[in-house]
Structures are given as C-alpha cells and as structure tokens.
Regions:
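Multi-pass membrane proteins that catalyze or facilitate reactions on polyprenyl-/lipid-phosphate substrates
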Residues: 1-162
C-alpha cells in the first residue's frame, strides 16, 4: 500500500467519525439489541467491511461501526455486532495462513503458536470489555481525532524523512 493513501484514509475516516457523531448527537437509536437487526441492516453493515478491504488505512471495525450508526443502530450494539463480525473474518484469515504454511510446524513452533493464540484471545477479551465500557459513556469522537492525528503524524514523518 502507498503510505500516502493510508495516511489520507486515516484522516478522512477520522473526519467521517466526527461528522457522523456530530450528525447523530441528540438522536435516539432505532436498534438497541442485536436481536433487532434485520437481514437488510446486517447486509448494509457487512457491506461497510468492503470499504476497509478496498481502502488501506481504513479500520474494518470503524467502517462497520459507522455503517451501523448511520442506519440507526446504537453505539453499543454497533460495536458488539462489529466484534461478532470479526470472528469469522479472523478465523478465515488464520485458517488461510495455516493452509499456506501447510500445517508444517515443529513442536516449538506449535507451542509458540498456541501461546500466541491464547495471549491474543485474552488481550482481545480485555480490550473489548474496556471498549464496551467506554462506548456506553462516550461517543467515537476521540477515535476520530486519534485517526486524524495519526494520519497527520504519518504524513509528517514521511515528509521529514526525505
């Protein structure tokens, strides 16, 4: 990927988060539980994953959360659903890597892989728990600003590195 594209998409999606959160302020969500999602809303939210696949520097989770909020899903349900969507994506990516390596691992490599998976799982659970608690009290504007600052820092780094 071109670093300029990644930096620009970081900034653009940061701005998109700020715009969506400002537009959404004071509005009441229409969907308050995952059980209320329809096939149509699931299809729309899932389609937002394509944005992340097409544009490097775009967060898959961020894209699906924004898509969900835009169709009236509450922040907590949007984040929860996004994390559920990640399971098949990550499982598929991991399975693809295993197939690519032909399942040929030494005992030491298999142990390292297992330890890495366990640590990643525990850290993911803790991170999701923290994020869900944060989302219940805050909007995603901080994430938008983070993306803008990170994108600007990436641009600045490569300008100064010349």
């Amino acid at each position: 990927y071109k670093r300029q594209t990644v930096a620009i998409m970081l900034i653009l999606f940061g701005i998109f988060f700020l715009v969506v959160e400002t537009w959404n302020k004071g509005k009441t969500a229409k969907i308050h539980s995952i059980g209320e999602l329809t096939y149509t809303s699931a299809l729309i939210i899932g389609a937002f994953q394509l944005i992340a696949a097409v544009f490097p520097g775009t967060s898959r989770s961020g894209a699906t959360i924004l898509g969900a909020i835009l169709i009236g899903v509450s922040r907590t349900v949007a984040a929860e659903y996004t994390f559920f969507l990640a399971v098949p994506v990550m499982f598929g990516a991991s399975a693809l890597k295993l197939v690519k390596f032909g399942f040929h691992f030494t005992s030491a490599e298999a142990i390292l892989l297992a330890v890495g998976m366990i640590v990643a799982f525990v850290v993911s659970i803790l991170t999701i728990k923290f994020l869900m608690g944060y989302i219940k009290k805050h909007d995603f504007k901080a994430f938008g600003w983070y993306r803008i600052v990170l994108g600007a820092a990436v641009i600045l780094y490569f300008v100064l590195a010349r």
